[in-house]
Amino acid sequence: MSCPASPSAAVVSAGALCLCVATVLLATGSNPTALSTASTRSPTSLVRGVDRGLMRPTTAAALTTMREVPQMAEGFSGEATSAWAAAGPQWAAPLVAAASSALALWWWAARRSVRRPLAALAELPTAVTHLAPPMAMFTTTAKVIQPKIRGFICTTTHPIGCEKRVQEEIAYARAHPPTSPGPKRVLVIGCSTGYGLSTRITAAFGYQAATLGVFLAGPPTKGRPAAAGWYNTVAFEKAALEAGLYARSLNGDAFDSTTKARTVEAIKRDLGTVDLVVYSIAAPKRTDPATGVLHKACLKPIGATYTNRTVNTDKAEVTDVSIEPASPEEIADTVKVMGGEDWELWIQALSEAGVLAEGAKTVAYSYIGPEMTWPVYWSGTIGEAKKDVEKAAKRITQQYGCPAYPVVAKALVTQASSAIPVVPLYICLLYRVMKEKGTHEGCIEQMVRLLTTKLYPENGAPIVDEAGRVRVDDWEMAEDVQQAVKDLWSQVSTANLKDISDFAGYQTEFLRLFGFGIDGVDYDQPVDVEADLPSAAQQ
């Protein structure tokens, strides 16, 4: 049967069909064989049409059970005369009403089409839609997604781009396998982005470790894309399961005691114990579980106003920035959020639950950087928090018998580093220098080198500096690298920014955080934003 040429014709056709069926029902009464095929017990073409139109886009449970489907067919066969003798008149009235409604709608559309034919046709589906229940076959979450940047935040994410980026890191970890034994059951607190994600990938695909991750990221909602961390975690779990590796992720606030309890239960049930605990949290605020007080971190110097140059990444402009010093309360709050207290609480919870394996290690990520960034970083509020992390490492080692190491990593483009004044300009210059020298590393390169050469080296003992830190910022802090960056710092301006720095590389890396700018992804094609977390079924 050909489709009606227009919405109006469709309405008329439907009304006429309903009217004809009603007439036949009334005429046949107790002889419904006129509606069935005499030589079969199957539904007629009309019923098969209903089956094709309704059963396929919905589940069988939504309409009838599969056991009831044969009964429906029998109801339309010539042998069910007693049922149809009563059903004919009952069906006729609703069908006549439906036919009348359809003809009335056609008449309304025809009148409006005299004045506004295009508008009438556009409004007709809306007028009809509210009369019928919504059908899943007409909904979709596929859309074209392009980056939308506001300051140092990208408000959109691309599911396929995020997945491809995770796959790239997995490929790198597999291509650089360890040469000595390493962790086998790993807990990563903050597993969905940055160093946490790359550490998890290295542990799983380098050491074949079972990994349990804790993260906080919003899933897709009402057709809106999820956070990048959600898509990253989904992609990681899929790849791990395909490789036959245990991978489970808990979505929750790492600062919350309930999340710690859920994690302990998951370890007890699935892993027994863990031999490496990775703490990789960067957050703007934290509620103290003991007091219920909300603390907010800030990025400010201490003691005096700090003025230096930075880059406006939206406009590609080098400008001066002045930052007022933090108050004592702001310093204390920043330490409360970004210091070592929560790391310590995690190890306490794991130790008291008996889920730390003998010889287990724990690491927390930190940064020191060059002196030009110290006023706003190492000597500022965030630096006070990082120094507290080092104090916590000593307490953890002494109190719980679990060796704890602050890991000082390289400056990289992350959502956190993008928010720190001065640092983005430093990174643009640093990338230029290190790429020219062939020593540039991203997150995955850093974490592969951390685990294979620093934390689990061939001699077995972690390699630390005089303060007990594991350093993977050693290539960044090399004297020749820092001197070259200083020379460029004194020259850089808006006019030459793109010539003497790797500003283009900075922008590319920033977009990649959200799944954009990935080779092999067609960003002009619609993509489904829905993505289920494989391990969610276990929770």
Swiss-Prot record:
Source domain of life: Eukaryota
Protein residues bound to NAD(+): 190-195, 216-217, 253-254, 281-282, 386, 412-414
The organelle targeting sequence, given as a residue range: 1-68
Entry keyword set: Fatty acid biosynthesis, Fatty acid metabolism, Lipid biosynthesis, Lipid metabolism, Mitochondrion, NAD, NADP, Oxidoreductase, Transit peptide
Post-translational modification: The N-terminus is blocked.
Enzyme class of the recorded protein, top EC level: oxidoreductase
Deletion consequences: Severe bleaching phenotype concomitant with negligible levels of chlorophylls and glycolipids. The levels of alanine, glycine, tryptophan, and arginine, as well as those for glycerophospholipids were highly impacted in the mutant under anaerobic conditions.
A Gene Ontology biological process term: fatty acid biosynthetic process
Compartment(s) where it occurs, according to its Swiss-Prot or TrEMBL record: Mitochondrion
Pathways involved: Lipid metabolism; fatty acid metabolism
Subunit (UniProt): Monomer.
Similarity field: Belongs to the TER reductase family.
Protein name per its UniProtKB record: Trans-2-enoyl-CoA reductase
